[in-house]
Design a protein with these regions (language model features):
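Conserved AdoMet/S-adenosylmethionine-binding subsite of the radical SAM
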Residues: 1-110
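Auxiliary Fe-S-binding modules of radical SAM enzymes
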Residues: 55, 59-60, 77-186
């Protein structure tokens, strides 16, 4: 997937496909338009990002065709979850990532939410994933990219991956065992 700003002319996405691109990643960072202006200054209209994601879904496919990351912890839970559901309903595979204010950035002093908050995010987002799973061209039991389930491999900044793996294990669709870290034998 190409992880870039969306082109101004969304028709360019057809050219990308002709060059061999098979997916896009247009990261929202946040779902609420007011937070988008504050957190993502200089990125243009959030509406254009949404339109680009929807165009990518039409061109590259539902689920695999367009991925977006949301930084969980930069906006209130309710609005973020509503936004994630809205994107997933349109075929945009949305992955919440844990917030960490980078040193030297305007958000350096902002404290991330606690672990319980992230557990709640993971549970609610995974409910959304399973609600729309049959409408997406993604097989959660086989796709090993981060943001999906990575076949039971843990990914530190996307806790919803571990929750998806846990539920798939309960359903008998993934082998038993805790999510694992690559290269670490336990």
């Amino acid at each position: 997937a190409t992880d870039v700003y969306p082109p101004k002319d969304l028709g360019e996405l057809y050219k990308w496909k002709s060059f061999g691109v098979n997916a896009t990643e247009f990261d929202n960072q946040v779902m609420n338009p007011r937070y988008f202006k504050a957190v993502c200054p200089g990125r243009g209209s959030q509406q254009h990002w949404f339109e680009a994601q929807e165009a990518a879904v039409e061109i590259f496919g539902r689920g695999r065709g367009c991925i977006t990351n949301v930084v969980a912890g930069c906006e209130p839970l309710g609005g973020m979850i509503e936004g994630i559901e809205e994107r997933m309903s349109k075929g945009v595979y949305t992955v919440p990532m844990t917030f960490g204010g980078a040193p030297g950035s305007p958000m350096a002093g902002m404290r991330p939410p606690g672990a319980e908050w992230y557990v709640e995010v993971a549970e609610k987002v995974v409910d959304i994933y399973f609600k729309y799973a049959d409408t997406l061209d993604v097989n959660l039991t086989e796709d090993d990219r981060w943001g999906y389930t990575r076949r039971g491999q843990s990914w530190f900044s996307a806790p919803s991956d571990d929750e998806k793996s846990r539920r798939l294990q309960e359903m008998g669709k993934l082998p038993p065992g805790l999510p694992r870290q690559d290269g670490i034998d336990v």
